Amino acid sequence: MKLLVILLFSGLITGFRSDSSSSLPPKLLLVSFDGFRADYLNNYEFPHLQNFIKEGVLVEHVKNVFITKTFPNHYSIVTGLYEESHGIVANSMYDAVTKKHFSDSNDKDPFWWNEAVPIWVTNQLQENRSSAAAMWPGTDVPIHNTISSYFMNYNSSVSFEERLNNITMWLNNSNPPVTFATLYWEEPDASGHKYGPEDKENMSRVLKKIDDLIGDLVQKLKMLGLWENLNVIITSDHGMTQCSQDRLINLDVCIDHSYYTLIDLSPVAAILPKINRTEVYNRLKNCSSHMNVYLKEDIPNRFYYQHNDRIQPIILVADEGWTIVLNESSQKCDHGYDNSLPSMHPFLAAHGPAFHKGYKHSTINIVDIYPMMCHILGLKPHPNNGTFGHTKCLLVDQWCINLPEAIAIVIGSLLVLTMLTCLIIIMQNRLSVPRPFSRLQLQEDDDDPLIG
């Protein structure tokens, strides 16, 4: 009976494992389409992306980090760290000690990036490996005195086709081989700000173009013979929500601009007081019922957004769809809001020898992507905030079981064991059934005559 149980569970475990061994070194391409909101997948048609998912895995929601902006979340993907830990805490920053400023047009100083070690640096430092990058934030900066062997300086006017051609050329023909590569594209974020997720007509056109680019990516990889052995992750940094001229929070109505310096604006405004901090806070805290005002030490723990000098003394967080302004104008749509909001979440899809086929998973954290990528590449991860266990179900070489599967396996196992037990009992009963009645056998003393 014990042997049967051991064999049963050995079979179950074996069924969840797959041989992913290969003589080729593992390779990984990480692709980001900026501002790709998770539910775009449900609301629009993506034939090329759906084919990609059908042969790979899909994570329906990736919970990103606060604040839900481009630079911070792209750095969280490749470091596995919260913003307070990796130091890229916003798209616009100020360091009070060095008096330095950071922005999307002034981002090349390694000072801002050196609080963490991104995966392309770790990979680049390995023997017989190199990294490549097509405009992923930070990849054109020497971080810890290391830069990828192959990279493109950021230029938004460079086409997706040119970026793709460079990346595939480097993946296909480099020495030492490129084993980790990144590719970044500004859409659908740029159009999302302009039109918004509720503009079906325009966003349908924009997202069709995105899907066509994914089709071009897959076709290019197949044409160059990279498709079968290359692991590809397609994801994003954040989503998008609709804003309105009717939902504005005008700071000039609440406080004189001479009292503070505005480091970053909506929907999370970073305030550096010029006068007493408490006075500035008191003037702002009742400014709008649609905005939370926090002293730095009171920022909710769930944001992991306190412990860094680049986080300003006062933070303003607008409600979803509301915009913090200094005048009456605003863009139609934005991101950066509370990272618990589904509208802020991106998705993740992946394909390749490291991943299952046709598997869907509900949610992971954006910081979980880093330890998963390190595992795929065989790299030792730096200390991080991610949890590798959250992504095990995506990978063919990992034992993984979620709650519904666990319940199904337990019930199935009990049914099988019950059937086996019943079968054994039936067989034992058959062997111990009494033989049919036979003629009475006389003992030796029964042969004596009854009458002497």
UniProtKB/Swiss-Prot annotation:
Zn(2+) 2 binds at residues 189, 193, 335. Its main location: membrane. It holds the Pfam family Phosphodiest. Glycans are attached at residues 155, 166, 276. It is a single-pass type I membrane protein. CDD domains: Enpp. Substrate binds at residues 91, 154, 189. It catalyses: P(1),P(3)-bis(5'-adenosyl) triphosphate + H2O = AMP + ADP + 2 H(+). The chain crosses the membrane at residues 407-427. GO terms for molecular function: bis(5'-adenosyl)-triphosphatase activity; metal ion binding. Residues 1-15 form the signal peptide. It is found in: Cell membrane. Residues 16-406 are extracellular. The active site is at 70 (amp-threonine intermediate). Keywords: Blood coagulation, Cell membrane, Disulfide bond, Glycoprotein, Hemostasis, Hydrolase, Membrane, Metal-binding, Signal, Transmembrane, Transmembrane helix, Zinc. Zn(2+) 1 binds at residues 34, 70, 237-238. Disulfide bonds join 254-287, 393-400. The keyword tRNA processing does not apply. Residues 428-452 are cytoplasmic. Hydrolyzes extracellular Ap3A into AMP and ADP, and Ap4A into AMP and ATP. Ap3A and Ap4A are diadenosine polyphosphates thought to induce proliferation of vascular smooth muscle cells. Acts as a procoagulant, mediating platelet aggregation at the site of nascent thrombus via release of ADP from Ap3A and activation of ADP receptors. Belongs to the nucleotide pyrophosphatase/phosphodiesterase family. This is Bis(5'-adenosyl)-triphosphatase ENPP4. It comes from Pongo abelii.
